[in-house]
Amino acid sequence: KLESFIQEHGVESVAWVQMIITCNTNGGQPVSMANIRAVAEICKKYGITYVADCARCFENAYFIKEREEGYQDKDIREIAKEMFSYFDIAFMSIKKDGLVNVGGMFACRDKDLYDRAWPDNMNYEGHVTYGGLAGRDLEAIAVGLYEGSEYRYLKGRIGQVQYLGERLDEFGVPYVRPVGGNGVYIDARKFYPDIEPGHFPGLCLAADLYMKAGIRVSELGASAFSYKDEQGVIHYPEIDLVRIAISRRVYTNSHMDVIAEALGELYQSGSPNFKGMDKSDWYGATTHFTSNYTPMWK
């Protein structure tokens, strides 16, 4: 598919190829080393820059170790090192696999690109040696990256996400299978089949779940990924997901039980509080974060 796209549209129309490991918008699914390597070969063939969004790179390395032949006996950091060997650029929100509350990272192989990038960082964030972060945050990042790449930690974290999936199975709750690394993604349209995408079934589920059990989740569907074309026609994604992201080192399996039971009751009742949501504001590219919605009460 990738090579066909490049051949159809031309190399000059492709600024770069970006791989998200793991992918936050499709259920937190991992990318195999074979896939990463194959895309690298295509990018090299056509001279296209290969970029990694690697916020959850250690979770991805864990799945490679668990599932991909030839990696069972390799260390998480060793696997991560091989992953990064295929990319030209990597950027990371360190708040994810770095286990901290602030910080990010940009790395590249091209010295010229680096020399052009870091002055902007200094203008907007801080000097390249600290990026506007306090010393304590830099120390936390150093520790977090080390602990976040420990196999025992990853096994426990991802095991908790898998436990939530197993509990949801008991209630027949529909979600993206298999569960990924950072959370469980619920199929909102199967909760509310009568609510059209334009009335945001994912947001309705998020609101219902919060009112029922005080559980806060994120919609990744019509609100996040719909867009207006040049003619003003709104296009909606094929699925409406609600992400139940599991915070690191915070919850016990008892909390997972509460989530599963609340979702199970909502799914089995088949009676949402809403007929849908109306978007009262539209803010273009940032709409998912900044728009306001009005509930259409039953």
Locations of the language-model features?
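Conserved PLP-enzyme active-site core in the AAT-like
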Residues: 1-173, 196
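Short, glycine-/Ser/Thr-/acidic-enriched flexible segments
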Residues: 24, 96-97, 110-113, 146-148, ...
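Generic non-transmembrane alpha-helical segments
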Residues: 38, 42-45, 163, 167-171, ...
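Flexible glycine/proline-rich, aromatic-decorated loop/lid segments
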Residues: 108-116, 136, 211-238
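Short, conserved charged micro-motifs
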Residues: 115, 193-201, 249-258
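PLP-dependent enzyme catalytic core of the Aspartate aminotransferase-like
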Residues: 148, 212, 224-298
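Active-site loop ensemble at the mouth of alpha/beta enzyme cores that anchors a bound cofactor
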Residues: 161, 189-216, 230-237
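Conserved glycine-rich beta-strand-loop-beta hairpin in the small C-terminal domain of fold type I
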Residues: 161-162, 176-188
